[in-house]
Structure formats: structure tokens, C-alpha cells
């Protein structure tokens, strides 16, 4: 199976069976009715892509009506969509982990999800992806059972929806579109390679902008094409994702680690090599991609990275399709035939079980929808918006989207960021002493313990500690759903001579009593800026005219700092790089992160 093979023609349809035709009065053969089932079958064979798209649409509508909830990955996507909806021009979300760039999650997904709705985006992405996958299967001549393989694809995309991976699904929609541009390019235009690249490369870039994981999977396909000396297709699919990742990492720095256990490794690794050994030997591109993916999966397990367990998604989406496509090439009831059937069945059991498990495990308790109001009311009464609030993460992670508009969360729902900034919840070292140190480090003023099961990773020990009682946590309010604790003598979010008036998700407002340096416990970002009451960035410190006209260029420059500026504090023992305000006078200062041509309000080196 290669990209260079001619594809099925656009109007390639199944010819009617001569046995089911009869000669009309004018001498022409006309189809003889052979039952509604045969008629339906012929229509399906004539329009397999349309049929697949319709089935996928129905499946995703059923998902929306009966299974979509507000927990798990959906909670994170709800949070990002709501954040960019409320603050479309802000580059830094202060309500999660002290501060996170939306772009570090996805470049375009939050904005599209805010515009279309998170669940609507999932339905569109899953449906279009299934249709494009069917198009690829139908157009590649090596696939003898494209309709059956298309239905396997529908099931895989439905399972992805069950797990709530909207951002990934959106990225895969563009990724499959880019792949279709390479593998389904009309044969009569086969020499117009620049036209193919002009279609595939932007889609590959959009795929990576939608989901870096989708861009990684395009890299697997690009590597397979490159190793098989199909360089134009490889460049079209592989260069744009690299550019998008490099640019976003440079402009919006982020680091973190996604965990990956041996159990998580086993699934994608085993199926990568099952595909490699079970598909026909002349499917060079498929076999090379499987080998690259298998080696890459092992490397992801060995080397900590932001990818981690996310690498399994390529096998979950496409291994079943490829295995089913290989089935007609085996002898019925031979050993290889049984191996393909068992592998295909095992793959679908795995992704089906995973989808159902994600729904059950992440379904929010009723308290998150029915009785959230009393908790929010209590948080407002005690002035929780002047510091951070730690909500012990429930299994649904519903707090990540339910509370950021009211208070700043010490955590959120991003496993990579959580493991990077809060390792004590994952390394089995959590105890009353270092928990207090952690509360002080992140300027946590209140702790909320919800009823229900905590997150299986990173919250069980915390829930146990808080539930049993700690000397520095005072229970100030509770009902059957929530327990609210106040931290004794909490560390302020901004050190004296400043006081915090409000810590919002898009803006931090502080009052400074006298000129000087103020340590603010917000992780530094080059986009952080001092803004006016309308959110517009203030002028940076400017060099004086005398300094510009100085005779000796080796003498230090002098600056006028009218509005204040921000410094990155040197990394401390916990790995934190906080923000420091250089305030020229007493008054109110507002920190935000507006998108602007010159990001932030940095202090020049001479003022450090």
C-alpha cells in the first residue's frame, strides 16, 4: 500500500450482477428486483464515504445525547473554551497552576471550542474524520473491504469521543485531511506536487495547532514516507508540524511530563508490531509506519516527555482499521487469519472498554451541578479571590472548569503541568509537613474537600490527609457535599508592601503601599504585562534622552520607569521562577498578559 499507486476513480461503482438483470422491451438490460436488502447493499457500495459519514454522525449524536458529560478530559476542554471566551485577548491563564498559556494546551482548539461548543466540536471532528478515513480507504486500491474498514473507523472515533478527547479529535480531523491529500491525490494530477503540498502542508500545520499529539502522528506517517523514498509527501506532512511546535514552544514556553506505565506501553507497542507482522509484506508504507511507531512508543516510555501515555492514541484509532484491511489477504481459517481476527477483536475490546471506563470513572457527582452554588457563595464570603484555593481533585476533575471564574485554583487539570510543578502528589512523599510547605509555596488560603472519589493518581493521599484533619487547616463550613478549610496564617500571593485586591483568571490586581520591589507568586511568563483598567498594556520603561546621547557607549544606560516593570526571579530550590514587580510609586497595579506585538512589560537589564 503506497501513496504512488493509482487510486480508485471518483465514479468507480460496483457493476450490477448480470444474473439479477432482465431485458426490457427496448432490448436494454434493466436490473431485476432482488429484494430490498440487495438494493440497500448496492446503494451502500455506490456511496461508501457518504454512508460512513452518516453512520459516524448518528453515532456522535447518540454520544452527545446519552454519554457526553462534564468530567474527565471534557472538563479541561470546557475550562479552556470558557477561559478564551471570557478573555480572548489574554495569553496567560492565572487560574490554573499559578499560570498557564492556552497555547501550551492547543493553539486553535480553545478558540474553536469556544465558538462552536466543546461537544459540537467533537461531533463535527469525529464525523468528518470518519468520512475522510473512509475516503482514504476507498481510494487506495490495496484495500479490498473499504466499507467494513470504514465502520471500524467509525467505532474507533466513537471510542475517542467516549473518552472525551475533543482537542485531539479536532487535531486528527486536520491530520486525516492532510493524509487524504497525500494518499488520495487525483492520479491525473500526480505531477502537480506543489499543489498537493499546498493542500497537505497547511492541514498538517492546523493538525498540530489543534493537537500536538496529532502532529506527532503525522510525523510517523511522514517518516514512513521518507524512509520509502517518497520525499514530497514526507515533506508535505512532516515539515509544518515541526515548525508549529518549534514556534509555539519558543513563544509560549511550557514543560511537563505525562506519565506512562508498563501497562500503558504494552497496548500500543504490541499492536504496532502485530500490524507490522500481519499485514501483507508489500504494504511497505504501512509496515514502516508501524515499525517507526513501535520504536517511538518504546522511546516515549524510556524518556520522560509531554507525550507519555498519549502515544497510545494512534494505535487505538488506526490499528483496527489496518488489521481488518489485511484480513482479505489471509487464507480463511489459517493461522494468520485467526491471528488477524483475534488481534482485531482484542483491539476493539481494548478501545471499547477504555471508552466505557472513562465515562464511568469521570462522571461528576450530582453535587457539581446541583449544589455548587453554596460552595461558591462561601468562597466569596471569605474573600477567597485574594489568594489561591486548593480543591482536592475528584475523579471527574470537574473543579477545573466549575470554579476558575470564581477563584484561582492552585491546580487544575493538566497532568503534565501537575507532575512538573507538584511532584509531591505523585512520588509517595506527601505528608503533613511537606503539604504545609506546598500550601505556602503556592499561596493557598483555602482548601476544599469534595465528597466522592478523588482522582486515582495524585489526590488519594491528599484527600486522606485533609479528611483526617490537619492542625493548620480549620474547618469553617461544610454540608453533605463539601468541606471548606481555612489555612492558618497563609502566605500572601504578593509580598509586602503589596496586598492583593483580586486574583482573577485573566488579571491580578494588587495595591502597593510604597515604591519598591514586590515578589508575586505567579510563574513568570514573557507575556505578563502591566495593564490599565481597560486591560491595555502600559508603556515599558524608556531610555532617557541623556542616556541616548551619552558619549561613552560603555557606561550604563538610564531609564525612566513611569508605570512599573516585571522581572523573572532566579529559580529557587523548588524550581519556581516567580515574578517580581518593580513599582516606581504607591498605587494600584494590574498584571495581565494581553496579546501584543511586544509581549509583556519586562524591566531592562539596567533596572535589575
Where are these regions (language model features)?
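Active-site lumenal/periplasmic loops and adjacent helix-entry segments of GT-C-fold
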Residues: 61-148, 152-172, 176, 191, ...
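Extracytoplasmic
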Residues: 356-608
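Internal/C-terminal transmembrane anchor helices
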Residues: 334-358
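Transmembrane signal-anchor helices characteristic of membrane glycosylation enzymes that use polyprenol
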Residues: 45-72, 247, 347-350
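Membrane-embedded helix bundles of polyisoprenyl
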Residues: 56, 130-131, 135, 145-186, ...
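Membrane-interface junctions at the ends of membrane-embedded or membrane-associated helices
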Residues: 96, 183-196, 227-235, 323-339
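Transmembrane catalytic cores of multi-pass membrane glycosyltransferases
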Residues: 61, 68-77, 87-90, 97, ...
